[in-house]
A protein has these predicted regions:
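Short pre-active-site segment immediately N-terminal to redox-active cysteine/selenocysteine motifs
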Residues: 39-41, 46-49, 116
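Conserved redox-active cysteine motifs that mediate thiol-disulfide chemistry
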Residues: 45-62
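Active-site acidic short loop of glycosyltransferases
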Residues: 36-39, 69, 95, 114
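N-terminal "domain-start" segment that seeds a small globular fold
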Residues: 2-33
Length: 167
């Protein structure tokens, strides 16, 4: 299930390099995909008014914790909400360990051609789009987990915590 929004730009396609600058994190640091090369990166666009987004974020936070930031970076980009709403939501979800970015004007969302929420882009370790997903459902979760695991190096997949993520 996904929440629709109107957009005209095309989304980055599988195999392409997406726009590198994702905005600023909560500490004010620019999140640049070039600095994350060598890791699998998930970029997900979300909003507080999107019920599937609110279901997806805790799952992604758990996955981030299980795999570890040395191999996986999950960037959650808030879509066009007031700064106060964004900061309140991040504060309420402080136990979800993601890189939180606020896209107040929707400029990053526009560059990514986001048409519905949640909208996920999964990048391989070279920074290229490997998979994309629109919406969120419990049924799709095993496939998403397997996609992430397929992009991780063997030594990360062999870790005990990573093996439990695929069960």
């Amino acid at each position: 299930m996904a929440s629709a929004i109107a957009k005209d730009a095309a989304s980055p396609t599988v195999g392409s390099l997406p726009p590198p600058l994702l905005g600023k994190d909560r500490a004010g640091n620019e999140v640049d995909l070039a600095a994350l090369r060598g890791k699998v990166v998930i970029v997900t666009f979300w909003a507080s008014w999107c019920p599937p987004c609110r279901k997806e974020l805790p799952v992604l936070g758990h996955f981030q914790r299980v795999v570890g930031r040395d191999a996986l970076e999950i960037v959650a980009i808030n879509y066009k909400e007031p700064r106060r709403t964004f900061t309140d939501l991040v504060r309420q979800n402080r136990d979800i360990d993601l890189t939180w970015v606020h896209d107040a004007r929707g400029s990053v969302s526009d560059l990514y051609g986001v048409r519905s929420l949640p909208h996920m882009f999964m990048l391989d370790r070279e920074g290229r789009v490997a998979y994309t997903h629109n919406g969120y459902s419990e049924e799709a979760l095993p496939g998403i987990i397997n996609e992430v695991l397929s992009l991780l190096p063997e030594e990360v997949r062999a870790r005990p915590a990573s093996n439990t993520a695929s069960r």
